[in-house]
Structure formats: structure tokens, C-alpha cells
């Protein structure tokens, strides 16, 4: 771990929390069904009100990873592409109505991943 640059750790945090945000979006969509069937997803255990804040925390952590890693513009892009999903998280929509949140989160992960890759390769020295 001593040979791995700090920037790589911060980008790893961002990538990991993007994946967690996608999982959380999926689990938020299924909260009611999971609670009825006895599934113990984190979102089902937390309930909708706390689960939406966990989703926000994932987005905040991925942005923090980029900012601390020196890629603040990627953090700004991430906020922009995740914003529609964040709005849905705080809406009254439930179940299948939250499917767009899952799709937006997946698309956002792809976009932010591409921006990260482009940024990485254009700043190599």
C-alpha cells in the first residue's frame, strides 16, 4: 500500500461509493417488497427516510473522494448527473415508480466513470 498513490485511494473511495449508491437505489425501489418478504437489505432495515439519506451520503462520499483526490471538476459533474436521482430519492414515489432513480444512478456511474478515465489518462505524467 505504500507504493499506491493517495489519489488512487481517493478514486477507489469514489468508485466504491458509486457502486453502493447504485445498490442503494435498487434497494430503495424494493423496500416495501423486501419488508413484506422478510429480506433484510440495509434499505429495508433503515426504512425509506433513512435510506434516502444513505443514498445522499454515498453521493457526498464519492464527491469527497474526487475533491480530496484533486479532481473537483469530476465531483461537480457527479453532482450534476446524480441530481435527478437525488430528487427522486426525496420524492413520494415508491416501488416501480423509483425505477428511473435506478436507471439514472446507473447512467451517472457510467458517465462519472468515463470522466474519471479521461481525466486520469489526460493528466498522466
Would you name each region that the model predicts?
Residues 1-21, 45-49, 54-125:
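Hydrophobic alpha-helical transmembrane segments
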Residues 20-43:
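Acidic (Asp/Glu-rich) catalytic motifs at the cytosolic membrane interface
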Amino acid at each position: 500500500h505504500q507504493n499506491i498513490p493517495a489519489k488512487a485511494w481517493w478514486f477507489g473511495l469514489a468508485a466504491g461509493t458509486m457502486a453502493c449508491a447504485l445498490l442503494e437505489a435498487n434497494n430503495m425501489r424494493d423496500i416495501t417488497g423486501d419488508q413484506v418478504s422478510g429480506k433484510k437489505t440495509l434499505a429495508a432495515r433503515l426504512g425509506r427516510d433513512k435510506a434516502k439519506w444513505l443514498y445522499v451520503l454515498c453521493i457526498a462520499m464519492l464527491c469527497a473522494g474526487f475533491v480530496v483526490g484533486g479532481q473537483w471538476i469530476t465531483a461537480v459533474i457527479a453532482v450534476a448527473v446524480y441530481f435527478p436521482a437525488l430528487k427522486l430519492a426525496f420524492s413520494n414515489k415508491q416501488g416501480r415508480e423509483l425505477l428511473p432513480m435506478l436507471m439514472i444512478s446507473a447512467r451517472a456511474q457510467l458517465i462519472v466513470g468515463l470522466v474519471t478515465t479521461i481525466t486520469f489518462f489526460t493528466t498522466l505524467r
